[in-house]
Amino acid sequence: MEIAVVGKSEFVVGFRLAGIHKTYEVKNDKDLESKIRECLTDRNLGIIVLHSDDLKHISPGLQKVIDESVEPTFIAIGSKEDAGLRDKIKRAIGVDLWK
């Protein structure tokens, strides 16, 4: 399984420098949704990283798909902490790491 990062260039550049090969730069909200949907169909991806601010710019239907997706698992990082990360990890691996 691979990790992918989707977002604006200033967000993905650090991941690229850290060795993540599947980084996708998007220029607008339409490109963001399109790239997320493309990543959902890639069977080699296990984790997809997004900036938490970008989640505000996608449609409610796609947000629901992201929230319910176990494989690939979506992780939103950035300006605010993702309270659902604990639940996503628990669903993905079946263990609560915080206990």
Swiss-Prot record:
GO terms for biological process: proton motive force-driven plasma membrane ATP synthesis. Has multiple subunits with at least A(3), B(3), C, D, E, F, H, I and proteolipid K(x). Keywords: ATP synthesis, Cell membrane, Hydrogen ion transport, Ion transport, Membrane, Transport. This is A-type ATP synthase subunit F. The keyword S-adenosyl-L-methionine does not apply. It is a peripheral membrane protein. Belongs to the V-ATPase F subunit family. It comes from the Archaea. One of its GO terms (cellular component) is plasma membrane. It is found in: Cell membrane. Component of the A-type ATP synthase that produces ATP from ADP in the presence of a proton gradient across the membrane. InterPro entries: ATPase_V1-cplx_f_g_su, ATPase_V1-cplx_fsu_bac/arc, ATPase_V1_fsu_sf. One of its GO terms (molecular function) is ATP binding.
